[in-house]
Amino acid sequence: MSRFAKVERKTKESDIVVELDLDGTGQVSIDTGVPFFDHMLTSLGTHASFDLTVKAVGDIEIEGHHTIEDTSIVLGQALAQALGDKKGIRRFGDAFIPMDECLAHAAVDVSGRPYFVHTGEPDYMVQFTIAGSAAPYHTVVNRHVFESLAYNARIALHVRTLYGRDPHHITEAEYKAVARALRQAVEYDPRVTGVPSTKGTL
């Protein structure tokens, strides 16, 4: 059964198209107009082994925030759609990811009950900016990215930085940890034939 989704969302602030194949091989094409966000979504798709195409046009001349958050909303919706009835999946996943001096952890429950927890980032990341050739990426949006993804995918997602100093490393480790946790959670478990829940539904 194909676990593919294509979701489009158009507002006055952005026009987003996301194509997602959960059973891909990490083939990724990202264009949001925010170079560092492109880099992060490329890492996410690659390390989750998803085939992921994202095309976003937004009001980045004002700021990249709208485009980043709206893209995360659509990505979450695509994930929910691609998961379908969730039969046979592992449901839970988690991963620790080091990046030089930084260590990040993510845990996922494909529960149908959206929830998000984000802890451990240094306070200075609220004001830090990663410059790019076009729109910059403000690391304060990390929380918005993962929260929008979790609530629209209807998953419980916990992301934490255990320690780290460089905002680039912290951000990238968080994205990669989420990617690896998602990869584990959405994989098929050969011992599970139905929905992995005592309720019989997720």
From Swiss-Prot:
Q: In which pathway does it act?
A: Amino-acid biosynthesis; L-histidine biosynthesis; L-histidine from 5-phospho-alpha-D-ribose 1-diphosphate: step 6/9
Listed GO CC annotations:
cytoplasm
The protein's Enzyme Commission number = 4.2.1.19
What are the record keywords, sorted?
Answer: Amino-acid biosynthesis, Cytoplasm, Histidine biosynthesis, Lyase
Gene3D superfamilies given in the database record: Imidazole glycerol phosphate dehydratase, domain 1 (3.30.230.40)
Coiled-coil regions listed: none
If you read the UniProt record, what top EC class would you report for this enzyme, in one word? lyase
| UniProt-annotated location(s) | Cytoplasm
The main location class comes to cytoplasm
Q: Which Pfam families match?
A: IGPD
SUPFAM superfamilies per UniProt: Ribosomal protein S5 domain 2-like (SSF54211)
- What does it catalyze? D-erythro-1-(imidazol-4-yl)glycerol 3-phosphate = 3-(imidazol-4-yl)-2-oxopropyl phosphate + H2O
What's a Gene Ontology MF term here?
imidazoleglycerol-phosphate dehydratase activity
GO BP, one example? L-histidine biosynthetic process
The text of the family note is: Belongs to the imidazoleglycerol-phosphate dehydratase family.
The protein here is known as Imidazoleglycerol-phosphate dehydratase
UniProt lineage: Bacteria, Bacillati, Actinomycetota, Actinomycetes, Mycobacteriales
